[in-house]
Curated annotation (Swiss-Prot):
<dbReference type="GO" id="GO:0005576">
    <property type="term" value="C:extracellular region"/>
</dbReference>
<keyword id="KW-0872">Ion channel impairing toxin</keyword>
<keyword id="KW-0960">Knottin</keyword>
<keyword id="KW-1015">Disulfide bond</keyword>
<keyword id="KW-1028">Ionotropic glutamate receptor inhibitor</keyword>
<comment type="similarity">
    <text>Belongs to the neurotoxin 03 (Tx2) family. 05 subfamily.</text>
</comment>
<keyword id="KW-0738">Voltage-gated sodium channel impairing toxin</keyword>
<dbReference type="GO" id="GO:0090729">
    <property type="term" value="F:toxin activity"/>
</dbReference>
<comment type="function">
    <text>This insecticidal neurotoxin targets two types of channels/receptors. It reversibly inhibits the N-methyl-D-aspartate (NMDA)-subtype of ionotropic glutamate receptor (GRIN). It inhibits glutamate uptake from rat brain synaptosomes, and blocks GRIN in hippocampal slices. It also acts on sodium channels of both insects and mammals.</text>
</comment>
<keyword id="KW-0629">Postsynaptic neurotoxin</keyword>
<dbReference type="GO" id="GO:0035792">
    <property type="term" value="C:host cell postsynaptic membrane"/>
</dbReference>
<keyword id="KW-0964">Secreted</keyword>
<protein>
    <recommendedName>
        <fullName>GAMMA-ctenitoxin-Pb1a</fullName>
    </recommendedName>
</protein>
<keyword id="KW-0528">Neurotoxin</keyword>
<keyword id="KW-0800">Toxin</keyword>
<dbReference type="GO" id="GO:0017080">
    <property type="term" value="F:sodium channel regulator activity"/>
</dbReference>
C-alpha cells in the first residue's frame, strides 16, 4: 500500500 501512495505522490 505504501508503494501505491508513493507512486501517486512521485507522479
Amino acid at each position: 500500500e505504501s508503494n501505491f501512495k508513493i507512486g501517486m505522490a512521485i507522479r
